[in-house]
C-alpha cells in the first residue's frame, strides 16, 4: 500500500484518537496530543459526513471536557486548526477554545 504523507498523517491522527478514546474509557486523563487527536478526528470525520464548517467549529469545542484532561492541558490549547476534506473540497476548520 502506497500512502501519501498526508494520508499517513490522517492515519496517525485516527490511531491516536482511538488510543485516547480507550484511555478515557478506562478513566485515564488525556495529555496534550491525545486531546488534540480526539478533536481533530472528530472534525475530519464530521467533514466526511457532510457537516458544515460552522457546525464543526461549535461542536468541536464539546468533544473534550476540561475534567477529562491532565492539569494544565486545557489552558495550553487555545485553538485547534484542522484541514478537512468536505464534499465540496478541502477547508480549514478552526475550533476556538476547544476544551472547556
UniProtKB/Swiss-Prot annotation:
Keywords, ordered alphabetically: Cytoplasm, Hydrolase
Any one of the GO CC terms: cytoplasm
UniProt-recorded Gene Ontology molecular function terms: nickel cation binding; urease activity
Cellular localization per UniProt: Cytoplasm
GO biological process: urea catabolic process
Pfam families recorded: Urease_gamma (PF00547)
Top-level taxonomic group: Bacteria
Catalytic activity: urea + 2 H2O + H(+) = hydrogencarbonate + 2 NH4(+)
Main localization of the protein described in the UniProt heading: cytoplasm
E.C. code: 3.5.1.5
Known pathway: Nitrogen metabolism; urea degradation; CO(2) and NH(3) from urea (urease route): step 1/1
PANTHER family tied to this protein: UREASE
Subunit structure: Heterotrimer of UreA (gamma), UreB (beta) and UreC (alpha) subunits. Three heterotrimers associate to form the active enzyme.
Family: Belongs to the urease gamma subunit family.
Protein name, as recorded: Urease subunit gamma
Biological classification of the source: Bacteria, Pseudomonadati, Pseudomonadota, Alphaproteobacteria, Rhodobacterales
Amino acid at each position: 500500500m502506497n500512502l501519501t504523507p498526508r494520508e499517513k498523517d490522517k492515519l496517525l491522527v485516527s490511531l491516536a484518537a482511538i488510543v485516547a478514546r480507550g484511555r478515557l474509557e478506562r478513566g485515564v486523563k488525556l495529555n496534550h496530543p491525545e486531546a488534540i487527536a480526539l478533536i481533530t478526528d472528530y472534525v475530519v470525520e464530521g467533514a466526511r459526513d457532510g457537516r458544515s464548517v460552522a457546525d464543526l467549529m461549535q461542536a468541536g469545542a464539546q468533544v473534550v471536557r476540561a475534567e477529562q484532561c491532565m492539569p494544565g492541558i486545557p489552558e495550553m490549547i487555545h485553538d485547534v486548526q484542522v484541514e478537512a476534506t468536505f464534499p465540496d473540497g478541502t477547508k480549514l476548520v478552526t475550533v476556538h477554545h476547544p476544551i472547556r
